Structure formats: structure tokens, C-alpha cells
A protein has these predicted regions:
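Glycine/threonine-rich flexible loop motifs
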Residues: 4-12
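Short, acidic/turn-prone active-site loops that include or flank metal/cofactor-
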Residues: 2, 23-27, 43-46, 120-125, ...
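Structural motif corresponding to alpha-helix initiation and N-cap regions
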Residues: 6, 78, 153-156
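Phosphate/pyrophosphate-binding active-site segments
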Residues: 11-102
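Short glycine-rich anion-binding loops that position phosphate/pyrophosphate groups of nucleotides
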Residues: 1-5, 25, 99-101, 150
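Thiamine diphosphate
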Residues: 102-173
Length: 173
């Protein structure tokens, strides 16, 4: 598939000796023409028996890994997002910024009910986030948002809008 927007992941992938592209849109996917091999689709594989505990084992391992990672950190972006998401009152809106915040929420926050979660997606997902947050706050008694510092700067002029009293924005640097 298409390369990611993450520089660190792309740099890591560039270290591999071989690159395999599996996608029918080759001309738009392997733009650097560096693929070692190109496939238009994955081969169809027949599985004769399924391990019935595989999914539950994977889920339990994931929970354990998340616990171990967060236990070793006294304060970090992950702990901050975990703390913020756990403290949201029911019935509130929660906007999660692109890039690190949304990845950390997915990886480290505990699922909850009674919270409406929102996110933007654009070319890089950071344009117009404050304006979106202000719009969301018009429909909820309490609105909370977590965004990165660059996301904040990309929509700084939105702060010219009238004051919103039911909104708390956390900016992660």
C-alpha cells in the first residue's frame, strides 16, 4: 500500500534490504521506483484450521504490553492522554488531534461509553482543527480537545472567534 505520513516509520522501512509493493495502483504507490518486487494482489491462501484462541491471546498480549509501557513512565504524552481521556465526564465531546494524539489514544486509552469522539482528516490532518473544535463545542455542554503544538499553530487565527466557555483544549508539545 501507500507509504505512511510518519517520517519515523518511513525511515525505518528504508533500512530494510528489500521492499515489496502489493497494490494494484503501482504508478501512484511506488513513486520512488525502489520496490524489489511488485505484486498486484496477495495470493489467496487457504487455511485448513484456525486457532480458536488466537484473537483472545492477541488481545490479552496487547493489554499486557500497554500496561507495561505505561507503568514505566512517570509522565509522558501517553500518560497525559490516558489521564485526560479517563477524566472526561459522560455526555461530553472529545476531539483528538491527528498524528501522535490519535495514535496514543488508540494505543493507551481505555474504551469508554458516553463520550462522543471526533477527529479531522485532511492532507496531514492538522488544518482547521481549532475551528472544528469550536464548531463541536456549539452542540455539547462540555467539549474537550487534545491537539499537538503544530496543529494548534496551523489554526491560530481561529482564536479570533468569540470566547467559548464550555471548552478545554490540551496542547501537547
Amino acid at each position: 500500500g501507500r507509504t505512511t505520513l510518519s517520517r519515523s516509520i518511513n525511515s525505518y522501512l528504508a533500512l530494510s534490504g528489500k521492499t515489496y509493493v502489493i497494490d494494484p495502483r503501482i504508478s501512484t504507490i511506488d513513486t520512488k521506483r525502489t520496490a524489489s518486487q511488485i505484486f498486484f494482489a496477495l495470493p489467496k491462501l487457504e487455511v485448513s484450521t484456525l486457532n480458536p484462541t488466537w484473537i483472545s491471546d492477541w488481545y490479552e498480549t496487547s493489554k499486557l504490553a500497554s500496561k507495561v509501557i505505561t507503568e514505566d513512565q512517570s509522565w509522558s504524552e501517553q500518560v497525559a492522554l490516558q489521564t485526560i481521556s479517563a477524566g472526561l465526564p459522560k455526555g461530553s465531546a472529545f476531539f483528538v488531534g491527528s498524528s501522535r494524539p490519535i495514535r496514543d489514544i488508540e494505543a493507551f486509552a481505555t474504551s469508554r461509553s458516553g463520550i462522543e469522539v471526533f477527529a479531522n482528516r485532511g492532507l496531514a490532518g492538522i488544518d482547521g482543527n481549532l475551528s472544528t473544535i469550536f464548531g463541536i463545542s456549539n452542540s455539547f455542554e462540555h467539549t474537550y480537545a487534545v491537539i499537538g503544538d503544530l496543529t494548534f499553530l496551523h489554526d491560530l487565527t481561529a482564536l479570533l472567534a468569540p470566547t467559548v466557555n464550555n471548552l478545554t483544549v490540551f496542547i501537547i508539545d
